[in-house]
Amino acid sequence: MKLFILIFLSLSFHISDNEIPPTNAKIIEYINSVKGKKVDRGECWDLANGALTYAHAKWESPYGFGKPINYKTEKIIPGDIILIQNVTMESKSENSITRWKMVEHTAILFELKETNKVMVAEQNVNGVRKVQINEWNLDDVKSGTLQFFRPQAN
């Protein structure tokens, strides 16, 4: 039974290209075109603005990025926008504990690796104002609000 549940959960997090809505697919297309480049002023929000504009998504400034998605109970998919507010993350290894805090940040879900491990596209991270792809473990979130949004077609 445990094996069945594990297989089911693994398969439920794999997304085929056919399952990605066209608006999300356009956002991923945009991210691929700007990796390693500075978007606008290099602020984290500028990346979301550029991606949503490129995808002709319907949204309201500053943070109405689309339909809110609860990542703990609903499926998240590449191209979803992530709003981070007062989030503390903590990861543990054999010899160390690493903590970091993001007061206010915007990122884009780029790829699902496995259950709760994701690749995100973001800029203005550690003073680097270029688009980069980083791995996050959503289980590392200890406090704060991590809100996902599903972009909507215009």
Region spans (language model):
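Sec-dependent signal peptide recognition
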Residues: 1-7
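Prokaryotic Sec-type signal peptides and long signal-anchor helices
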Residues: 8, 12, 152-153
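N-terminal capping segments
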Residues: 10, 14-61, 66-69, 89, ...
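Aromatic- and glycine-rich peptidoglycan recognition patches
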Residues: 22, 35, 100-154
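...with weaker cross-activation on analogous glycine-rich loops/strands in unrelated enzymes
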Residues: 58-126
